[in-house]
Each structure stands twice: as structure tokens, then as C-alpha cells.
Swiss-Prot record:
Gene Ontology biological process terms, A to Z: translation
Entry keyword Ribonucleoprotein: yes
Entry similarity comment: Belongs to the bacterial ribosomal protein bL25 family. CTC subfamily.
Originating organism: Helicobacter acinonychis (strain Sheeba)
Name of the molecule in the record: Large ribosomal subunit protein bL25
Gene Ontology MF annotations: 5S rRNA binding; structural constituent of ribosome
Record keywords: Ribonucleoprotein, Ribosomal protein, RNA-binding, rRNA-binding
CDD domains: Ribosomal_L25_TL5_CTC (cd00495)
């Protein structure tokens, strides 16, 4: 389980001092949950996120434990280092909006015909209760030829999960190389 510290002071000087000590500044918020300003050790946080199996994961802040999902993050545009992360605390049975990653498998037929695979949408916006949240959408790209794409409406439908993105948006496709 990922452990963090609750920030008592939310001043700019305090945030700078924490960053200098190797901490990542974060906020935990959600429906029915009081906002918590906190900080996590940067390297263990990144390692934990890479190894986790589910979108929802537990964090411990002080004596409280929250089930959270990464809602948004900010990176330094030059160094590409994480600066800040927003964590949405989820409550069982309460619908929330999430962004679910798209993963693809296979090698498109169109790559042999001088095509390039274009991942247009890396995440799909959905609304559901946390217990129905899919970990990812898996797309088989093997049958795709040049100028073909998979749209949001072609994705696998999950029960009790409402996709918020428009049906005609391309998720992944093969375009002709110039």
C-alpha cells in the first residue's frame, strides 16, 4: 500500500521544501470526502503506479485509508518529471467519471502495405460506479488495413459502464505513410 504524509501547511514555501526532499505534491478529493492536501515520496509513487494491476488502488494518509484513482497529473515540460497529481477518492456504489486506458494487441495488416499505426485516443472517458470500472479497453488491431480505424462505438461494451466520448471518434487506425 502506498503511504503519504498529510500536508499541514499548504504554502508555496512548504511545497518547495517537500519537492526538494523528493516528495510529490498531491490532492485527494471525491464525493463525500473532505479534500486532503498530501505528499508522497516521488520514486516509490511512480514505481507503485507502474506495478499496479487495477486503476483503483489504496493509499494511506495518516490513520485513514482511501481507495483512489489518478484523475489528473502535471509534468514539468522540460524534465518530464511529475510535479503534481490529483487523486479521486472513490466510494462503492457512487458513480464517478473516469478515464480508462486503451491497450492494443496484434500487428495490423496495413503495416505491410506502407501504413502507420496511429493511436488517436489513449484514454476513454466513462461514467460508472467503481466496482464496474474496467481496467482497460483491449483493441485487436490485426484486421486493420490502410485507411481503416476503430471507433468508440466499436469498443467492447461493459455492463453498467456508460462511455462519455462520442461514438464516431476514432480510437486507433492505420493511415497511409507519406
Amino acid at each position: 500500500m502506498l503511504e503519504g504524509v498529510i500536508r499541514e501547511s499548504i504554502t508555496k514555501a512548504n511545497a518547495k521544501a517537500l519537492k526538494k526532499d523528493g516528495y510529490l505534491i498531491a490532492n485527494v478529493y471525491g464525493k463525500g470526502v473532505e479534500n486532503v492536501s498530501c505528499a508522497f515520496k516521488l520514486n516509490p509513487f511512480i514505481k507503485y503506479l507502474k506495478e499496479k494491476k487495477h486503476l483503483i488502488f489504496p493509499v494511506k494518509l495518516g490513520d485513514k485509508t482511501f481507495e483512489v484513482v489518478v484523475q489528473e497529473y502535471q509534468k514539468n515540460p522540460v524534465t518530464n518529471e511529475l510535479i503534481h497529481v490529483d487523486l479521486l477518492a472513490v466510494t462503492k456504489g457512487v458513480k464517478s467519471k473516469f478515464k480508462v486506458p486503451v491497450k492494443y494487441q496484434g500487428t495490423p495488416v496495413g503495416l505491410k502495405n506502407k501504413g502507420i499505426l496511429m493511436l488517436s485516443k489513449k484514454r476513454i472517458s466513462v461514467e460508472c460506479a467503481p466496482e464496474h470500472l474496467p481496467n482497460h479497453y483491449l483493441v485487436d488491431v490485426a484486421p486493420l488495413d490502410v485507411n481503416e480505424s476503430i471507433l468508440v462505438r466499436d469498443l467492447e461494451k461493459h455492463e453498467n459502464v456508460k462511455i462519455l466520448d462520442h461514438d464516431s471518434i476514432a480510437v486507433i487506425g492505420v493511415i497511409k505513410a507519406k
